[in-house]
Amino acid sequence: MLKLLLGDPNARKLKRYLPIVSDINLLEEEISPLTDDELRAKTADFRERLAKVSGLEKQRELLDEILPEVFSVVREASKRVLGMRHFDVQLIGGMVLHEGQIAEMKTGEGKTLVATLPSFLNALTGRGVHVVTVNDYLARRDAEWMGQVHRFLGLSVGLIQQDMTPLERRKNYECDITYATNSELGFDYLRDNMASDMSEIVQRKFQFCIIDEVDSILIDEARTPLIISGQIERPQEKYQKAAEVVASLIRAAEMGKDGIDPEGDYEVDEKQRTCTLTDEGFARSEELLKVNDLYDPKDPWAHYITNALKAKELFVKDVNYIVRNGEAVIVDEFTGRVMPGRRWSDGQHQAIEAKEKLNIQSETQTLASITYQNFFLLYPRLAGMTGTAKTEEVEFEKTYQLETTVIPTNRPRSRNDWVDQVYKTEAGKWRAVANETAEVHKKGRPVLVGTTSVEKSELLSSLLAEEQIPHNLLNAKPENVEREAEIVAQAGRAGAVTIATNMAGRGTDIILGGNSDYMARLKLREVLLPKLVKPEDGHKPPVPLQRRSESSGFGEDKDVTTDNSKPLSASSALGTLYPCVLTEDTEKVLIDLERKLVADWGDRALTAIELEDRISTAAEKAPTNDASIQLMRDAISLVKSEYDVVVQKEEVQVREAGGLHVIGTERHESRRVDNQLRGRAGRQGDLGSTRFFLSLGDNLLRIFGGDRVASLMNAFKVDEDMPIESGMLTRSLESAQKKVETYYYDIRKQVFEYDEVMNNQRRAVYSERRRVLDGFGLKKQVIGYGEKTMEEIVYAYVNPDLPSEEWDLAQLVSKVKEFVYLLNDLKPDQLEGLDIDELKAFLQEQLRNAYDLKEAQIEEQKPGLMKEAERFFILQQIDTLWREHLQAMDALRESVGLRGYGQKDPLIEYKNEGYDMFLEMMTNMRRNVIYSMFMFQPAPESDKE
């Protein structure tokens, strides 16, 4: 009602941009006739104008002023280099991002292209722009693909990848625009703040950041802090023994109520993700371990048992992790991707290794950590884009001060979202999914089935194999991950069936009829890999299907026609990666190319990554002087033109049949992830449809739906293959999802509030560290520490309320000598008759003199050594004490929750105690540095030889 009276606020916001869009369109007539060189010269002209203005705020005002002309130049460059012209709605998206907001743009509306506008505009200041994606593959794809526009206009483009050296990282961060993943950026920031020398620092000062899939990074990953850790030794036998004990414990059938223990050894709360031993469980564990008390501080077992219980009940193989090469590798619950190198902390990963009988790796201790919330708030201006942000609008506004603007689609949407079907049992649901997939597949429509875990995707895969339906499987299993781009390239072909675990952040659009451009690149890769790539750099040629029924004949070579002009039949097209057999002339071109490249680059002399890079460059449209790359480019173009004939026919066929059909097999905890899956169908106004299949056994209904849904289902006397469509059930589902979202929002808010305390401390420590690394005024800093220490000693041993005769000056002098041995001649009678301020001033003067003397002694041995020592001792103390402080703060965080029972606010208690602990840490740091500096005795040069 309010919307009708006041008008839609989003529409009002969009209206504001329309005059600027008109200006950009008018400028197009002026910009289009320019030559490439004249277009490039515009960049230098913009930079010159910005160089005349100092200060970020003033520069931003000028950026707003030149925005229409800059956007017009970028649009023209994109037209020439990529063959893509920004639509008007994409220009609006660019302006929204430039203003530091979140642009919600539906799947397939060209978010990646939109980012070129604000990133180019803000990079003109020379302060650097970061474009953040969710994984290395997307960062590389965007840097190569969109980077062409920036490079064409004369800007440098950097890329940060997981395996880069610090030197490569620094070079890439120095570029005008740098593409990176959120985790690489965060870890580089933490590593920079652990550096022992300025030369080790790779990042420069943050300015502007655009986050792709902003909801995935700022919301889904916000519960997990980034942690850099060092190893600590813990007895491995304890993990193994705990796993054995827990295997023999029995889970209680239901949670205990009203303080009464349930029957069983332990209870599990799936909502809170906790496991708790009952009284019987405690007694049984102690008996099996032959100990008197699980909490005995000399031989603690409780922590190991709790982690082993969680590993048994809450961490499920092929859902939360997979076992690969003898290691437990985490699976990201939002994207379905594996996260090698990441480990659960606090001994949880070791408990899982013990459960799976794997080699148990050392436990770790936190050296540095930060949450994504606080990391991204370090940027003076932050922007983001996603297909689904509106549901989390409030959180973006409250936590990050980011407004959300919904950008209209370029063409109206033609997707049908069919009503959910709910089944009584999981078995009934999966049979229904297999049946619907078969039905739609028979009509020649492509089908995408989204599952929530590796295990479920393999279950459906076996059901489809029974039905003899050829299909592709895309999940976290390593053999499937490597095929990701190939699988997605064919997912839109007639009758293609793709099973994918969590399509969120997959980053590749599903194009109806198939992606001929990508298939041509894959064909080139298939031809060149065996001849150009080193044997030890093992590769796998593209494989069209992971699963097919042996008896079906689908995809067998016998189906492939030898008549080159004919496309493959529908069934066999699904059994091969490529839409048609190439003509003899084209095959000959590929063989000649392969020979030429072997002659140029050497026989099997490249790594797989090097070849991928060269194929990517060849697939670009940017001009090249490299003859080999040009030959590859011509070959890709030739192959693509042949594939296009079939792909375009198939596209018409798929459109007529109704487009892509998306099936969801479970509602995700977040409505956003459901919307992302739906958004795969009907991109850019295409036809398409979606349907969700659910069962009462689904986690969402089981954990958050409450007893209401269960009793409702018992009331339905239906068999398991009968679907139920009920408004009441759908409402229960949506309220369950809202409950979960609120629950997780509260967790993230709590993580943020607690980390805010740490964040203020982190900023103070890191700025102190950076000052030391810069190396300016180190002596002044150390003397400052000494003066503060003298003041603290005076206040510790002198009571101003007592007459001066009663002051214990002997103790005071003794304490001063502990810190400064060079003041050994100091006598208590020298201090008699001085008031407190005079005492402080006298001791501080003595300290300064002693420090000058110490400096002279050290410098005599080696000039410049004193400065090195100052830097070494301050950094050593900051790092050691900060590490201990992080552990102490973690322990405080764990224990402070219990204060709630005493009617105290745990957060306020944490803030107060944390602040006291921080002050104590800084005091210890100052005192330790002073003590170390005076005790420092370098070995004479002759001793070192």
UniProtKB/Swiss-Prot annotation:
Any one of the GO CC terms: plasma membrane-derived thylakoid membrane
InterPro entries: Helicase_ATP-bd (IPR014001), P-loop_NTPase (IPR027417), SecA (IPR000185), SecA_CS (IPR020937), SecA_DEAD (IPR011115), SecA_motor_DEAD (IPR014018), SecA_preprotein_X-link_dom (IPR011130), SecA_SF2_C (IPR044722)
Record keywords, A-Z: ATP-binding, Cell inner membrane, Cell membrane, Cytoplasm, Membrane, Nucleotide-binding, Protein transport, Thylakoid, Translocase, Translocation, Transport
GO molecular function, one term: protein-exporting ATPase activity
GO BP field: intracellular protein transmembrane transport; protein import; protein targeting; protein transport by the Sec complex
Gene3D superfamilies reported for this sequence: Helical scaffold and wing domains of SecA, P-loop containing nucleotide triphosphate hydrolases, SecA, preprotein cross-linking domain
Location(s) in or outside the cell: Cell inner membrane; Cellular thylakoid membrane; Cytoplasm
Broadest EC class assigned to this enzyme: translocase
Pfam families, alphabetized: P-loop_SecA, SecA_DEAD, SecA_PP_bind, SecA_SW
Reaction(s) the record says it catalyses: ATP + H2O + cellular proteinSide 1 = ADP + phosphate + cellular proteinSide 2
Annotated region (Disordered), positions in chain: 533-568
Family of the protein in this entry: Belongs to the SecA family.
Function: Part of the Sec protein translocase complex. Interacts with the SecYEG preprotein conducting channel. Has a central role in coupling the hydrolysis of ATP to the transfer of proteins into and across the cell membrane, serving as an ATP-driven molecular motor driving the stepwise translocation of polypeptide chains across the membrane. Probably participates in protein translocation into and across both the cytoplasmic and thylakoid membranes in cyanobacterial cells.
Protein name, entry field: Protein translocase subunit SecA
Naturally occurring in which organism (per UniProt): Prochlorococcus marinus (strain MIT 9211)
